[in-house]
Regions:
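Early extracytoplasmic/lumenal segment of secretory-pathway proteins
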Residues: 26-97
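Extracytoplasmic ligand-binding site segments that recognize negatively charged/polar headgroups
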Residues: 84, 92-214, 218-231
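Paired acidic/hydrophobic, glycine-rich loop segments that form the ligand-binding mouth/hinge
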Residues: 85-89, 216, 233-238, 253-254
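A ligand-binding cleft/hinge motif common to bilobed small-molecule-binding domains
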Residues: 94-97, 228-229, 233-251
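Periplasmic-binding protein-like
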Residues: 138, 199-209, 248-272, 318
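A bilobed periplasmic-binding-protein/Venus flytrap-type ligand-binding module shared by bacterial periplasmic
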Residues: 141-148, 185-188, 265-276, 295
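Mature extracytoplasmic/periplasmic domains
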Residues: 271-331
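Conserved C-terminal helix/tail region of periplasmic/extracytoplasmic solute-binding proteins
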Residues: 328-356
Length: 356
């Protein structure tokens, strides 16, 4: 834990003069704003000090509403008809769906000046270069307790076809598409395959694994996490969460298996039904300021798509392969595809079977 606090302190001190200059300029140009911004976000997925700073700088309150899966995000927006929220954190796959549903508002580069700091490779991933501002990116991999397992994890097969000592000690992400995609990798198939036989084989592998799984949920990132306490020995996990857990236990390891994995990028987007568009744009631009993007990345242990922010981060952070995967990992990995409705139904059916 001390390492995390020291890193946060160093990053904050490095950026304090930059932030003060940015704050003074913003205050001078500030128009009248709404009093509350509703931010639809994953839990524990933003540096709370940045939220407080935005509130103080703008004289507003940021109210976070949390969701725990992409499916729940969609359900929440369907139930509310997209009304009642201003800014949303959306994965690359969710962003495409939200744009098709007409729930999110196009964002121009003029409206978010700090887009100029983004690495062009991430801007090219924006849906039609119109929706969403890159927030954080990373990988899906495996975290495990090296002291308990006493053998290296190198393949997805070790997670999906577990040995007897892992019975009940496995945690799996609560995302049907990622679970099936990596099951395909474990079988030596392409993670993007929509071939019915490939999907059926992956589903059978997941069914066989299910009795050995202790829980289907996103891994908690605190001292009570099952990986920290030893209740779980191995978990499918997002890379930054594994890096955070390393600070609670030195024997937690993170690996992207040799078959490769999914890359992901989360984005900040504006709900079309917002009544606070000016404030929403200001919040997104604030989070995209290089100093703020760097602070957020350091706090959460995820890679930032903000090229100017990377220049402000410590060398040890940028050199950590769990945060910034090496070229060999990137070459065997890719973003999750959109799947045909028929395939999605197959995937969701098997996932419902094993998780209920």
């Amino acid at each position: 834990m001390f390492a995390r606090e020291i890193l946060r302190l160093l990053v904050a001190l490095m950026f304090v003069s930059i932030t003060m200059r940015s704050e003074a300029a913003a205050d001078a140009a500030a128009p009248a704003m709404a009093r509350e911004l509703v931010f639809l976000n994953w839990s524990d997925y933003v540096d709370p000090e940045l939220i407080h700073e935005f509130e103080r700088r703008n004289g507003v309150r940021v109210r976070q509403v949390y969701y725990e899966t992409d499916e729940l995000l969609t359900d929440m927006l369907v139930e509310a008809n997209g009304i009642g929220f201003d800014v949303v954190v959306a994965s690359d796959t969710s962003l495409r769906a939200l744009s098709r549903f007409g729930w999110i508002e196009p964002i121009s580069e003029k409206a978010v000046p700090n887009l100029r700091h983004m690495d062009p490779r991430w801007l090219s991933s924006r849906v039609e270069n119109t929706f969403g501002v890159p927030y954080l990116w990373g990988t899906v991999g495996i975290a495990y307790r090296a002291d308990l397992l006493q053998r290296p994890i190198t393949s997805w097969r070790q997670l999906y076809s577990p040995t007897a000592d892992l019975h009940g000690r496995i945690l799996m992400i609560q995302d049907s598409r990622e679970v099936i995609g990596m099951a395909l990798k474990a079988l030596g198939r392409h993670a993007d395959s929509n071939d019915p036989q490939d999907i059926a084989d992956a589903a059978e592998l997941v069914r066989a694994q299910a009795p050995h799984v202790g829980a289907w949920s996103y891994v908690s990132v605190n001292e009570d996490s099952a990986l920290v306490t030893g209740e779980a020995w191995i978990a499918m996990i997002y890379n930054g969460d594994a890096v955070t857990l390393r600070e609670y236990h030195p024997d937690i390891r993170y690996v992207v298996p040799e078959e490769g994995s999914y890359l992901w990028m989360d984005n900040l987007a504006i709900l079309r039904a917002t009544k606070n568009k000016a404030l929403a744009l200001r919040f997104i631009d604030f989070m995209s300021e290089p100093a703020n993007a760097a602070r957020n990345a350091a706090y959460l242990h995820f890679a930032t798509p903000n090229r100017s922010a990377e220049r402000l981060l410590p060398a040890e952070f940028l050199a950590d392969p769990a945060i910034y995967p090496p070229k060999a990992v990137l070459e065997h990995s890719g973003f999750m595809p959109d799947r045909p409705p028929k395939v999605l139904r197959m995937i969701n059916t098997v996932f419902s079977e094993v998780t209920q």
